[in-house]
C-alpha cells in the first residue's frame, strides 16, 4: 500500500503529481496498438484535476478524507439532487466514480470504495438520463418578448423604482444569450464582466468558481451584442445605485441594496413567470431549459463539441455533445 499521508493531508496536490505519471495511465487499462501506454494530455489532466478536486471538496464537507470515505458516501456524492434535479447525470457520476476507483487502485486500498459504489449502482438498472428540453427559435423569441418590464408608475415617482424588474430582465437575457447556469448568473461578479467590446459587439464574461456552484469550471462565456444591449443599461443603473443609494457588494445581480446573493429558487420562479407570460409550457421552465436552448443552437450552427465544452465551462467534451439530444416540446394546448 502506498504512503497515504499526502493523499489525506493534501489530496489535490497528490493527485496532480499522480495524474501525469505512467502509473495513472496504467490504471486506464488501455494500451496503444503497439502495446505502449497512452499518456494523458495536458487538457485531460486539467479535467481530471478539476473532477478530483470537486469530489474531494464534497468529501471534506462531510468530515471525511479520501481514505475514510465509504462506498455509501460516494453513492451519495453522485446521487446529489439540487432543486429537485440531479447535480450529476448518471454518465458523469460514473466517470467520477471511475476516476476515484483508479486512485484507490493505485493506492492499493482494498476493498476499493469507488468500485463498491459502482457495483452498488448497477448501471444497467439506472434510469436513463432525461435528454432535456430546449426552446425552438420561435419559442425563444416569445420568451424574450415576455421578459419583465417596468411596472406601471403611480403618481409618486421614486428614484430607481422598479430596479429589480430591470435586474431580472437583464439576468434572464444573460442566462439565455450566454448559456450560463443559474448558479453562474447569481454568482456573477462585476469584475468578471469584460469592458472590451469585440468587432461583432460581444463582450466576454469570465466565469470563475468564486461565489458560484462548486462544479463551476473557470471559462470565458461570450455575451453577444443582443445580450450586451440588455446588460449594459442595467450595469449603468447599478453603478448609479451604488453612488446614490450606497448599494453594497460585487454581485452583478444583487438581491437587494445590501448586496445579498439572489437564491436559485427566486430566479426559477422569475423565469417560470416569463415562460407563463409567453404561453410556454411551465412544467420544464427554468434556467436549464434556457442553457439547453443555447447549447443546442450552438451545435446546430456548426459548433464542435470541444468548442461548446469551453464556452459552457464543462469538464468533458462528451457532456457538450449530449446537448444535441435535447428535445423541443410543443406549446400547451
Language-model features: where?
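Basic, Lys/Arg- and aromatic-enriched nucleic-acid-binding interface segment
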Residues: 145-182
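Conserved tyrosine-mediated DNA breakage-rejoining catalytic core shared by Y-recombinases
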Residues: 187-229
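Short, basic (Lys/Arg/His-rich) helix/loop patches that form interaction surfaces
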Residues: 157-158, 269-310, 314
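Flexible interdomain linker/hinge and immediately adjacent N-terminus
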Residues: 112-150, 256-260
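Alpha-helix N-cap/helix-start motif at helix boundaries, enriched for small hydrophobics
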Residues: 171-172, 183-188, 308
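Catalytic-site neighborhood detector that most strongly recognizes the C-terminal catalytic loop/helix
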Residues: 305, 312-333
